[in-house]
Regions:
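Arg/Lys-rich, alpha-helical DNA-contact motif
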Residues: 2-6, 11, 15, 25, ...
């Protein structure tokens, strides 16, 4: 059984995030989100991209970062989250090993 995947158009993404089309285009140009399709009229966004767009806009607004800096900040935030998950996994493994000895 296959899962149904829903996509949002550029119009739907701007309505749901209250972000202008120009801003979404700038975010896409920086690679912060990567919709399907070659041109804005063809773009299709996966639902999790809504949260990424909103996070990018908050960083841009609150920290007054340009879009390139926002892209870097989001990449670093994601890397820190991954490192924390890895650290937690390794701690659990170490705890199991300590119990065995």
């Amino acid at each position: 059984m296959s899962e149904t995947v829903y996509y949002l158009t550029l119009s739907e993404i701007t309505q749901s995030t209250h972000v202008s089309e120009d801003t979404v285009v700038a975010i896409v140009e920086q690679g912060i989100v990567q919709p399907r399709g070659k041109r804005p009229a063809e773009w299709r966004f996966e639902p999790p991209m809504v949260a990424t767009l909103q996070r990018a806009c908050r960083l841009h607004r609150d920290l007054e970062l340009d879009w390139a800096a926002v892209a870097l900040a989001l990449e670093l935030i994601e890397e820190v989250q991954q490192l924390r998950q890895d650290n937690e996994r390794l701690r659990r493994q170490l705890a199991c090993l300590m119990e065995l000895s």
